Amino acid sequence: RNLGKVIDTLTCGFADLMGYIPLVGAPLGGAARALAHGVRVLEDGVNYATGNLPGCSFSLFLLALLSCLTVPASAYQVRNSTGLYHVTNDCPNSSIVYEAADAILHAPGCVPCVREGNASRCWVAMTPTVATRDGRLPTTQLRRHIDLLVGSATLCSALYVGDLCGSIFLVGQLFTFSPRRHWTTQGCNCSIYPGHITGHRMAWDMMMNWSPTTALVVAQLLRIPQAILDMIAGAHWGVLAGIAYFSMVGNWAKVLVVLLLFAGVDAETTVTGGSAAHGALGIASLFNQGARQNIQLINTNGSWHINSTALNCNDSLNTGW
């Protein structure tokens, strides 16, 4: 609503100036005033949708916070090497969102390649947006960062200055306040999922290629149960204060946004019932025959020869080919 007042001042002032133009002022002024009224109608619709619908009272500040993690990014990157373009999974500098001592928060669909000394090596992807140096997730600095963001959003909402804080945050997006800690390059050709390749990983990789933002949201939703336990055990006061305040005022959409922000950097993917299912899978796997080669023999002139040793589709997924 406060931003709408600024827009109304600009559009109405422009309409008044157009009306003072000699000869053509009357028609131009009328057209400009009609345009100003149209803008006002759009503002009223936005105010109704964001202020009166239950659970949808988003402030500009929270939308700005969410934008730093859900910016659509291409699932493939291209680097230029001596005039030749190569498709790579290595993150460019534009995909790096936040850097800590042992972790990098980046856009989904790539893996950071960090140069240390005279060698470049891939960091281990812990989540679609977080990579670490050695495969362990140091959450101390990332927790402090999320606590600060959510605490600031809660304070701005409680003081009814969300539009002002959101405007300041959006302007701050144009600048880099966090210094670069690592030298990221695109010379590693990292794999998004290192290790044994299974059918599930292949499907997840394809989903990240189709829609990185969808992959990000799904991964965060699956980590919410573990994130709730972590924020209580770790005493994350900024996040807890934000969830408590937004729950008391009935802004459940903001509660979900805070949970997604926290789960994106501070939990492992844990599905409810996953432990029981994993135990049942361990027992059932005892009876699996595993991957095997179906050897086909043919008889030619009284001699038997091997005709084919190719793996079928399921066997190829189990063996990792």
Swiss-Prot record:
Region annotation (Important for lipid droplets localization) ranges: 48-51
Miscellaneous comment text of the record: Viral particle assembly takes place at the surface of ER-derived membranes in close proximity to lipid droplets. NS2 associates with E1/E2 glycoproteins, NS3 and NS5A, which interacts with the viral RNA and core protein to promote genome encapsidation. The nucleocapsid buds at the ER membrane where E1/E2 glycoproteins are anchored and afterward associate with nascent lipid droplet to acquire APOE and APOC. Secretion of viral particles is probably regulated by viroporin p7.
Gene3D superfamilies in UniProt: Hepatitis C virus envelope glycoprotein E1, chain C
Residues covered by region (Interaction with APOA2): 6-57
Single GO BP term: virion attachment to host cell
Organism: Hepatitis C virus (isolate TH)
Side Cytoplasmic, residues: 1-52
Name of protein: Genome polyprotein
Positions of region (Important for fusion): 149-180
Region (HVR1): 268-294
